[in-house]
């Protein structure tokens, strides 16, 4: 039993761990910076942790060690994810499982434990202070206030970001609240004691004591809801609550005596006696310390003496009416204890910086924060989506529409047939060279083959996951049918609402199935496009001679004079089309090059440094860069988006001009054709080759899109299959557990007393058979005689005749026989001895003989 009046928080203990090794491995795996750049920082973080976890005594030097390590943990929390890869081991300080550690890969968990030990150190320093002087009391109150402040910081700032299913029992919200109120109560108690020593007025001391009582009461109520705070602490808080309630009334009674309110004095003294008696009830069981018990007993003696004196004086002299307790005015409260969070804990960034700072330089300052790396990836994804989908894809779509319009107008075939009546047009030669150099047919066939392989691979992964879901659903249905819905009471497979349960997985399966359905239809469209132009592409991929053989020469080699003006206007309009296409190609190439060169890392590091300076207490998150992203994308690519709109308007004008010129050209050409100068066959052949070239470009784009789609889909289905495997395994384990629970025998079949009684009844009514000679049964031992003279107990069964104990059959063990070791003489052996055969010669227990009852 301790002799202290107040409680302190014990330290949580940890084991040695190389945090630097986990950080080093993480830097190597996730960052593009070499870990050797941070060798000094890695050594420093290990040294800080080693010093912090070895703080085991109540000495002020430990405060700096814990605060320094905690500050660096807060700082590196903005550089690394919470699960950096270090398994932190900590033993509880309170509760009934202090020998069982909790291991977590969690930086916030480590920070929480370090701050918890800082609060424990403050409380132990307070208990160790000299509370026999006013200065010592002020110091102790300050330590207790800092302890409550650190615990408040843990509760409000660290615990909400812990990201654990449930915090340790001695660090959950209820336990922390109880500890906060406890140390505030002990700080307030120091102020009360100082007021007593300084000779404050009774009324002021009463207000301080009343607040002490309130705080102990709040601490005790929270402790009752905690799983970690012991019964001894709860009894201590309750006793102190009643003690200071009595002390407050005692001081209020003294104030009443001074103000000559003798009736109220007696009422308050009576209430004080009642309170101290309630406090003394907590002494049962030996939970309270000797000092607390002595304080209660001393206060009770003083109260009883004063009450006796006050009642005699009032009865003989003053004759004041004693008011009931309900009419007494509630005592005012004077609160002095406040939870004070040390600035080193509340604002650790202010104590990190250059080497002259209190905690020295911040570690890993040259390491790019993890959130910045994620932000870079997010920006690059948004940039690529903007460039590819909103600009390049839009331009390519407009170009495809333009070629469809030109093809419907039979352009440029009709122009080329007239301008180049013999041989191959220059544009066609360029297209053919491009087809040959790209090995177009093989490229398209290989691309379609790759798409088939990727699709088959993704589909196989998906089918595996779906088969697992179907098998699990079938198993669950079979067991549900076997045991019934009342006993098989877990959710059905498709109705499991857990975060990654059946409901979500089946819904995702439907989504993925939809992806496959739409992609298969798109793949078929692309194949049909390829099959439609395969033969024409084969001609384009051939030699110039084979192309010339495919294209018939015109029957006339000169252009009629009547057709030249219309031909010139159409050629001019078509040249505008080609210039528009050329500008688009150059713009797309330039845009892609600029997108590849758009390195945001230097600028985002500057922005991250600005954010760290502006918000030192806030860990950098990707959301902090949203405005930065928007401004940068607008500055770099807004002009390109506007150019797309201008291109769209320009294309509409050019198309209108081409249609007008082509209409005039076709009218003039029909007159020439009627005169016998037609070249329709050559025109159609040239148009067919030109259309095949542009269709080839379109198919190449489609194939690239398909390949990217299936590569992205593979990541989705693999992740989904992994979730399915985990969920199915969990469901099967759950099913086995539930089935074992259902198949367990009912508790009624385990009634040992009933079985033993039935066995004795059976032995009483049946003559036991002679035991085998190799299994000796013990001699029956006479049971003790029952005690006849007992205290009379009134019972509704008094008239029932008392049952006599039944005799124990030979060879049957009874509870009153006890346990004997050795080889007792059994009936069979006795019979052998009567015939002159030797019996056992040694009654010493032999371990090889086991344990026998008798």
Swiss-Prot record:
Residues 632-699 form a coiled coil. Residues 746-759 have a biased composition (Polar residues). The keyword Coiled coil applies. Residues 739-782, 801-854 are annotated as: Disordered. InterPro entries: ALIX_V_dom (IPR025304), BRO1_dom (IPR004328), BRO1_sf (IPR038499). Keywords: Coiled coil. Residues 5-402 form the BRO1 domain. The keyword Coiled coil applies. One of its GO terms (cellular component) is endosome. Residues 767-782 have a biased composition (Pro residues). Residues 827-839 have a biased composition (Low complexity). Interacts with pacc-1 by binding to its two YPX[LI] motifs. PANTHER family: PCD6 INTERACTING PROTEIN-RELATED (PTHR23030), PROGRAMMED CELL DEATH 6-INTERACTING PROTEIN (PTHR23030:SF39). Belongs to the palA/RIM20 family. Required for the proteolytic cleavage of the transcription factor pacc-1 in response to alkaline ambient pH. May act as a scaffold protein that recruits the calpain-like protease palB/cpr-8 via snf7/vps-3 to its substrate pacc-1. This is pH-response regulator protein palA/prr-1. The lineage of its organism: Eukaryota, Fungi, Dikarya, Ascomycota, Pezizomycotina.
